[in-house]
């Protein structure tokens, strides 16, 4: 049984204050023209004083960042309806909008916010003028309002109003695309600031960079954070004791365990889809090799062998095999290993190098760092056909991490001569940048659904 360690670093739990000076902010760089127009009408506030967060603005930003929607600017809206009965369907149809979200917010006696909101199908409403009818259970014709895709109400504490806005974004996204939204998720990453007393900092933020919180800071390097499937823990690499060691930390309680501390290198931890096993890389026998560690029994199993270096393991969604990067062919390429029989095959062939591979949640695509004449860029490979599409044109891309719905990828790149976090949609049409203001930002990891 592993010894549970008290933190020797400074740890701040997730409820601590955010570091405003270090906040990340999404800057959209490409892809908006190809997105679907949608109207996010400013929610009516029926109370005194300002709201702690602009709910409709958060929703509009979320949908825009997905790369699939282009919210209409409020200055271009022909009207600001607050319910489906006030919608002028012809006016919105003329603007090219086929969906509209509207709502209102009040405050109850307990000081909580009551949010009412509706998603409206403008095309359907324009065809029926909002007067479609259907038979009731009693056999009478009644207004069906089938142009209202959903009509919801929620009571939310003020400190969670922005969080609930992400929830609304998820509902809208799923209703209109048929895919689960990933706006109510988090990212973890490492910030390096050589001028700070603790140059290495592990931080967690909402997917869009807001509510950034310090999780851990150290005078020695921190690397390779990876989320557990339940979103409560992070596995990471620390050099606090003079060599690379793997730890698992509960980001809510601060409790952590040292998982491995073998001679030489311990790195690249990855939780299995069921959270019971950790894939990792050790060099205790010489070259870098991939292992799996059963977290209950602590049984260590060696997966790769030989003189070549094998690293960066990542689990298939079914948990039955791993992909990893190996230089066994001379230069880094990505391979697949079946965990039941250790049969191994190379899966990347296009480009002089391919590394940092991850598989989308649906198992269809491999996302990787591809080296070609243009440098190191993110690429997507269809695992059935082998077709490869280069997704980015940024500089020295590394450490891709896929959103839990498979729609976006976050990664580290170079901008203005420093490491920043960037995003790209899975089809490569939409790109965004999350610039940091006080350090180099590396090793991003996208959380599971929360």
UniProtKB/Swiss-Prot annotation:
Keywords: Cell cycle, Cell division, Periplasm, Signal. InterPro entries: 6-blade_b-propeller_TolB-like, PD40, Tol-Pal_TolB, TolB_N. Pfam families: PD40, TolB_N. Part of the Tol-Pal system, which plays a role in outer membrane invagination during cell division and is important for maintaining outer membrane integrity. Belongs to the TolB family. Its main location: periplasm. The keyword Cell cycle applies. Residues 1-22 form the signal peptide. GO terms for biological process: cell division; protein import. It comes from Vibrio atlanticus (strain LGP32). SUPFAM superfamilies: TolB, N-terminal domain, Tricorn protease N-terminal domain. The Tol-Pal system is composed of five core proteins: the inner membrane proteins TolA, TolQ and TolR, the periplasmic protein TolB and the outer membrane protein Pal. They form a network linking the inner and outer membranes and the peptidoglycan layer. This is Tol-Pal system protein TolB. It is found in: Periplasm. HAMAP family: TolB. One of its GO terms (cellular component) is periplasmic space.
